[in-house]
């Protein structure tokens, strides 16, 4: 089985959400490790946000069926992005037989995008 998901977001939307909601925004959408790795850079947070949406699309459920923190976007030892699933997202991936994930992130000052592919 092959599944894919893609998402793009305006970085300004993330900036606006941070200004409007502050720590509540961070705590709702990102794990502590994601926040540490993003180093306060809004484009990096926007790319992670887009990646979570893309993973949910690849799972075939949309983000409403899984928790935002059930999908974690981190860096591996070579600083490449990687997907770690927890909770409902992990259970859904297992039920679909999805075992390997690949992710590509990109951002400018205006937009961030993510493409994910899962195979099983």
Task: Please state what every model-predicted region is.
Residues 1-120:
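Core catalytic alpha/beta fold that binds nucleotide/phospho-ligands
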């Amino acid at each position: 089985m092959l599944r894919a998901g893609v998402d793009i977001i305006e970085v300004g939307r993330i900036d606006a959400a941070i200004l409007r909601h502050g720590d509540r925004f961070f705590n709702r959408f990102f794990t502590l490790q994601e926040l540490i790795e993003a180093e306060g850079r809004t484009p990096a947070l926007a790319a992670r946000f887009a990646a979570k949406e893309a993973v949910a699309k690849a799972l075939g459920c949309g983000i409403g069926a899984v928790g935002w923190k059930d999908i974690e976007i981190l860096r591996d030892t070579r600083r490449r992005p990687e997907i770690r699933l927890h909770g409902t997202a992990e259970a859904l991936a297992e039920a679909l037989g999805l075992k390997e994930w690949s992710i590509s992130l990109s951002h400018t000052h205006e937009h961030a995008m993510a493409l994910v592919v899962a195979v099983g």
